[in-house]
C-alpha cells in the first residue's frame, strides 16, 4: 500500500497495545534509485542526423537554492526520511536542443505516484515544485520523498525528457512550460528572445571568409583583368 500525502493509520489492538502503521512508515528511512530517463524527440529525423543528446537526473541533499542544486549529491548508500528535502537536477549535454522535464514519478516501478504532469508542471506542490529552467538544457526543482510503501527499501524516481531543436519554431511553445503558475512565463519568453545561442545557431551571420570572397569577386582588379582579356582577343582576330 502506498501512502501519498495523507494520513492513513491502521490501529491494531492487542490487549492494551496500539500499533500505528502510519507512524512506522513515517519513521522509515529508505535509499533512493534513479531510473533511466525516458527520452522523447519532437523530430526524429533531426535528432538522428545530429546524434542523441545525453541527459541525466541527479538528486542532491536539502538546500534552498533550487536554481542550481548546489548541495552535495546523494550517494548510493545514503538514506532519506519522510521529511528530507531533495533537490532534483536535470541536465542535457547539448547546445542544439531544448529540453522539457515531464511525467515524473516516485515510488516503485510497479506502484508509482506521478508528481509531474505530461505538460511539465507539478501535480502536487507539497511533493515537488514545478521545475525551474535556468537554460534550455538545465532545470531544477525542490521536493520531498513523501511516498512510502510497506517494507520498501528503495524509493525509485523516474522522468521523461522531451527534446526539441532550438531552430524548430514549435520548440519555443514546448519549453520551458508557461502554464505552471510559477510566475516565470516572462522570464522564459526573455530567455528565448535574448538567446545568443538561438541567434548563432539558427540565424548565423556570414563568415569572414565568405565576405572576403564576395568582395574579391566584385573588386576593380578583376574588372580590369576582364577588360585586358577582351582587348587581347580583339587584337588577335
UniProtKB/Swiss-Prot annotation:
InterPro entries: Cuticlin, ZP_dom. It is found in: Golgi apparatus, trans-Golgi network. Expression detected in motor neurons. GO terms for cellular component: Golgi apparatus. Residues 1-20 form the signal peptide. It comes from the Eukaryota. The keyword Phosphoprotein does not apply. The keyword Cytoplasm does not apply. Keywords: Golgi apparatus, Signal. Interacts with vps-51 and vps-52. This is Cuticlin-like protein 19.
Amino acid at each position: 500500500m502506498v501512502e501519498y500525502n495523507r494520513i492513513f493509520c491502521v490501529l491494531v489492538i492487542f490487549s492494551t497495545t496500539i500499533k500505528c502503521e502510519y507512524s512506522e512508515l513515517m519513521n522509515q528511512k529508505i535509499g533512493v534509485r534513479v531510473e533511466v530517463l525516458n527520452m522523447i524527440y519532437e523530430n526524429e529525423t533531426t535528432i538522428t542526423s545530429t546524434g542523441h543528446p545525453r541527459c541525466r537526473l541527479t538528486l542532491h541533499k536539502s538546500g534552498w537554492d533550487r536554481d542550481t542544486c548546489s548541495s552535495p549529491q546523494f550517494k548510493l548508500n545514503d538514506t532519506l526520511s519522510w521529511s528530507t528535502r531533495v533537490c532534483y537536477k536535470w541536465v542535457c549535454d547539448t547546445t542544439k536542443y531544448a529540453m522539457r522535464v515531464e511525467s515524473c514519478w516516485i515510488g516503485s516501478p510497479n506502484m508509482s505516484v506521478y508528481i509531474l504532469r505530461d505538460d511539465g508542471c507539478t501535480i502536487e506542490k507539497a511533493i515537488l515544485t514545478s521545475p525551474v529552467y535556468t537554460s534550455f538544457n538545465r532545470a531544477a526543482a525542490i521536493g520531498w520523498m513523501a511516498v512510502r510503501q510497506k517494507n520498501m527499501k528503495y524509493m525509485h524516481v523516474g522522468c521523461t525528457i522531451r527534446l526539441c531543436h532550438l531552430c524548430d519554431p514549435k520548440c519555443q511553445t514546448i519549453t520551458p512550460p508557461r502554464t505552471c503558475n510559477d510566475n516565470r512565463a516572462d522570464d522564459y519568453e526573455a530567455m528565448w528572445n535574448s538567446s545568443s545561442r538561438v541567434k548563432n545557431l539558427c540565424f548565423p551571420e556570414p563568415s569572414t571568409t565568405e565576405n572576403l570572397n564576395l568582395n574579391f569577386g566584385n573588386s576593380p582588379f578583376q574588372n580590369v583583368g576582364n577588360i585586358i582579356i577582351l582587348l587581347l582577343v580583339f587584337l588577335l582576330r
